[in-house]
């Protein structure tokens, strides 16, 4: 769609890679070693990207929703019935502050999925939140946060991460399956999250209630 930036998340491999990507992207290794760190470990991998309120006040994150167990209330589950044990999306501050303004987990996020299986998650500050960025209008929302969390830092910086935990061996479209930077789309397909920059809340509010998600999906790259 015109004037909409659609950015995919990228796979996390190690801490050095993240710092290099942020400050010296031309030095980023083409085949970084997967050593984990921060939220990445033997059972969890994630993807990430950066946001800035300087460039947009309202973002929408979307991907096809992986199958996860519904057992928040103690329901029993069968491991063969899901793609991964747990998935979540969180916003964050700077690498040093390591703040986490907000998160949403799979059972909450699944409520925003339409009949195509895609979820719609609005990311903004509370004061920028569109009036229709609600569960009643068919979408989820999380707080973007108030900057990088550093003294004299940027009040507009934010990061977003998507976590996959205990992925089923038969599911081949998770962050675990990405072995090289730049292969995320090829590997993850519809499960690769994209962040759409809608810039301001009026543009999202124009999608109505219930939110016309077909117009959001039309903003994604072909």
Indicate where each model-derived feature is located.
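A compositional/structural signature for long, glycine/proline-rich flexible linkers
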Residues: 1-222
């Amino acid at each position: 769609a015109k004037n909409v930036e659609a950015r995919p998340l990228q796979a996390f491999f190690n801490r050095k890679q993240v710092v290099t990507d942020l400050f010296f992207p031309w030095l980023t290794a083409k085949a970084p070693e997967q050593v984990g760190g921060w939220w990445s470990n033997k059972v969890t991998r994630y993807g990430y990207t950066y946001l800035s309120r300087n460039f947009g006040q309202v973002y929408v994150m979307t991907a096809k929703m992986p199958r996860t167990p519904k057992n928040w209330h103690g329901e029993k589950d069968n491991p063969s019935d899901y793609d991964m044990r747990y998935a979540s999306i969180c916003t964050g501050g700077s690498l040093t502050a390591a703040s986490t303004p907000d998160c949403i987990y799979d059972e909450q996020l699944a409520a925003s999925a339409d009949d195509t299986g895609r979820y719609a998650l609005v990311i903004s500050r509370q004061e920028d939140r569109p009036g229709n960025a609600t569960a009643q209008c068919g979408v989820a929302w999380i707080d973007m946060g108030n900057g990088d969390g550093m003294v004299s830092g940027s009040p507009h910086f934010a990061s977003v991460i998507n976590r996959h935990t205990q992925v089923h061996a038969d599911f081949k479209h998770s962050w675990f399956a990405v072995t090289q930077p730049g292969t995320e789309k090829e590997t993850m397909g519809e499960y690769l999250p994209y962040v759409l920059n809608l810039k301001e809340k009026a543009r999202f509010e124009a999608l109505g209630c219930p939110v016309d998600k077909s117009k959001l999906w039309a903003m994604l790259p072909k």
